[in-house]
From Swiss-Prot:
The gene is prpB2. The prpD2B2C2 operon is essential for growth on propionate as sole carbon source. It comes from Corynebacterium glutamicum (strain ATCC 13032 / DSM 20300 / JCM 1318 / BCRC 11384 / CCUG 27702 / LMG 3730 / NBRC 12168 / NCIMB 10025 / NRRL B-2784 / 534). Mg(2+) binds at D92, D94. The lineage of its organism: Bacteria, Bacillati, Actinomycetota, Actinomycetes, Mycobacteriales. Transmembrane segments: none annotated. It catalyses: (2S,3R)-3-hydroxybutane-1,2,3-tricarboxylate = pyruvate + succinate. This is Probable 2-methylisocitrate lyase 2.
Amino acid sequence: MAGLFSSAVAPTERRKALRAALAAPEIARMPGAFSPLAARAIQEAGFEGVYVSGAVVAADLALPDIGLTTLTEVAHRSRQIARVTDLPVLVDADTGFGEPMSAARTVSELEDAGVAGCHLEDQVNPKRCGHLDGKEVVGTDIMVRRIAAAVNERRDEQFVICARTDAAGVEGIDSAIERAKAYADAGADMIFTEALYSPADFEKFRAAVDIPLLANMTEFGKTELLPAQLLEDIGYNAVIYPVTLLRIAMGQVEQALGDIANTGIQTDWVDRMQHRSRLYELLRYNEYNAFDQQVFTYSADSYKPIF
């Protein structure tokens, strides 16, 4: 479990854990955290990793996912999330916030944030949501330079660099596969196959590419929602649920606000709320209180560390 003010597991160890999860026969499941507290809940629920979605970072700022967020904003939220969990954190780094030199700087900043890895995509800059029409991709040569620059800048060899290709919806799946092979040759540790349609598409990609693959199970998009077990059986190594928790939370928020606006009282929602005691458990309130009591009653003669 994380320390009070930072994870008890060093960043390099969490990066090793992510690589081990990608090499395991079981698929690594990584829900998207819309806040540090959500990341802690993900860990307690028994998942293998935490995902930081660019769309969620943007939505939290009431912005659309069209490349408006900055590296500073994404790195800040990533650092906040990585601080509170012992799980590996994978971050959506969009296009790397520019061209190859910017992609290199992105990796440096995210390493400093303590996350386990990031993915860079082959859309033009600024990008748009991968499940919207009208997106464009850069040439394979440009994306290869992005990946190579990121790999070259990486200081910790355990840090995972994933290449996302959006080409399936633009140029077709065969082109996306050829791009994925080129990205792997450039040093990518994993391929994120965005906006595939059916199990057959996932199977075709798995048969053609021999490095770890990541599936995106996002709602209301172009991809059929598939069980983690089916993806594991196909041979995928990781699956993300990028906006799932935010959509659940905001759906409940809007319903509750509507009811309170109409009735003037929240009693119908009390049984559906997270109880105060459960919130305190997630916040580790008692551990902070014990720490505070130790400091408050501190004396040099009687001091006995409790951690």
